[in-house]
Amino acid sequence: MLAFVLLVLLMSATTQDDSFFVKGLEFRPEAVKNPLRNEKQKWSGEKMLIIPSLVEESCDHDLIVTNFCKSSLSKFGIVALVPSTKNCRQYQNLGAITATTGNIVEELDKLKKGIFSKIVVINNRYDGIDLPDESCRILIMDSLPYFDSLADRYEEQACPNSELINKRIAQKIEQGIGRGVRGEKDYCAILIIGSELVRFMRSIATNKFFSPQTRKQIDIGIEIADMAKEDKTESPIKVVLSLIKQMLVRDEGWKEYYASEMDTIVEDNAESQVYDRLLKERQAEQFFCEGEYEKAISSMQRLIDGLNVDDTEKGWYLQQLARYTYPTSIAESIKIQKSAFKKNTQLLKPSTGIDYTKISYIHQDRLNNIRTYMRKFSDYGELFLSVNATLDNLSFGIEATKFEAALKDVGALLGYVSQRPDKEIRKGPDNLWCGSNDHYLLFECKSEVSGTRQEITKHEAGQMNNHCAWFEDQYGPNANVDRFMIISTKTLSYEGDFTHKVKIIRPNKLKILKDQIKGFIKELKPFSLDEI
């Protein structure tokens, strides 16, 4: 596309998605791997990253939002970046100003002119916004960003451990936290809230995708949170505010500490192979678009043969291979798609050839299962962050796929064999657990049902009945099973009936379960996970 251009120069402190340079703009991987840098300047500006939940667990998302929405502003601006309208609504209900497509220019202009009244909330805009100096001295980075396109969201759901996906998420986060520091002398306190975002920034598995500068700022944030924990005389929110005040009053101790730590940054020398993979993806797609199907197939096959990734991601590329194969052989394409689906059940299910695999507790031990789950994590901190993020997703109002994934994870945490039949074979209940003596727990999840709903509808009762019939067909009428519907109301509509005994889990009971799991995890804090 750009072959006729002799030189293209792009200038940016960060990029939201540098994979587009290779796949979209057709840049050479070498150019993206080796950007022009000012070697004399390791960092610019001052970002005080604060993770309130690390200061004290009770200093959670809702507490931060509530306190800062109530703040009266006169000397500087406070801005919150949120990923969705749902997140935005919480701020609106507390009196915040929402910057919409229609008024965002006006609201940002007010901040730059020094007109401060209330916190300003910006929805899903992580780039293209400058908030220098007093226009934003406190930036709240609220929750993990979403991808904009359905294709990107599908890829994220299908390949959650993908280096490509996690690198793009990290770049989007970096774009966001850079909004409040726009120059060498600029400074801003950045509050990181939302358990999924905190986990992504702290976890060993994903922290590595940030730039060395951001990783160092996260390390500084963890360090000051640890130091702040020692202050037992003040409430957690006051401790957080005192940290921010140190930066705002230009405390010399803080400035020296920040500068000395940032000066120790060492640039990454490890070379990522991800850009070479992007080049191969682009080449295969180009062949396919040009009708060179055999070349597309062989190009994608070479890419797959050289992969060193988990099964979920390998399945993703097999699905691409199936797509390329379809014009030349439908039968072979379906065969490849079966292989892809067996590796990753988040992908498209073939019309035939996929059988349900029953779960059983034979040769299982619940305590050993719990130990195995916990030893996936390097330490208690990693375990705690992961469980917190999972339990946050196990909440009413959360998107169904996230809720059901969280429930599956909770089952594994508690030592059950845990499965999502509806997701994995497109038939059966949302979640199924199997415990000791093959005692099954069947779940139908209605997390997106409004909290004001009065009744369980006839259609919802019918769904539950169908899933109960499916279970009996697979496991027999004498299987030991408890059936649950997770929904905000317990009243069944006049038109509806259940064919089996169904227990209802409402918000209060779900909260009790989550609190008990949190309590269980906290009991493990004094122990090494390897010794449990």
Predicted regions and their residues:
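Conserved RecA-like ASCE P-loop NTPase motor core of nucleic-acid helicases/translocases
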Residues: 8-13, 75-84, 192-193
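Catalytic core segments in nucleotide and nucleic-acid processing enzymes
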Residues: 85, 104-107, 114-115, 139-143, ...
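Long, largely alpha-helical accessory region at the distal end of helicase-like NTP-driven motors
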Residues: 86, 183-307, 313-314, 529-532
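Residue-level signature for tetratricopeptide repeat
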Residues: 286-287, 317-327
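Interdomain/boundary linker segments immediately adjacent to catalytic/signaling cores
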Residues: 337-340, 344-398
